[in-house]
Structure formats: structure tokens, C-alpha cells
Amino acid sequence: MNSGLVRELFEGLDDDEVLRIELINGNKIYCLLSDNVFVAPAIVKIMKTIKKGKYQIIMIDPNAIAVICTMSRETYDLKLQRGELYV
């Protein structure tokens, strides 16, 4: 998925308003950032399901931890760096 597809998914948004997540298998998924995701001290929910429901971000901790759930109930612990998540 490239930034053109990101714009297609989130029409009218800049790329810096979209959170990119790269999974272990190299697939990338994208999620809209909520306004307070990097400033709230508590976990905030990102209310956006992408890729037709296959992947869903259920919560993100601004202190650099996020969790992704897949439909197969697998979870991945991810690290947040400069607005992007990496496994």
C-alpha cells in the first residue's frame, strides 16, 4: 500500500495525519490518527477499522506501545517511533 492508496482511503487528509503500521510479514496497514493520540497520558482508542476489517487497531499508548488485533485473534506488540509503528 502506498501513499496514493492512503489518500484514497482517507480522502482529504495529509500523509502526516495517517499512522503507518508495518507488520512482520512486510504488509503495511494504515489508520487515521485521533487528535489527541500523542498528548493524552492514557490509552486512547483509534476508532478506525481498515483493510475491510482484517486488521484493526484497538488501542494505542502514547508512551510508545500499541496493540493490533487481527481477525485470527493474533496480537502484535508494536513500538511507536516518529509517528510510525514498527514491529
Feature locations, PLM:
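Conserved RNA-binding domains used in RNP assembly and mRNA/RNA metabolism
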Residues: N2-V87
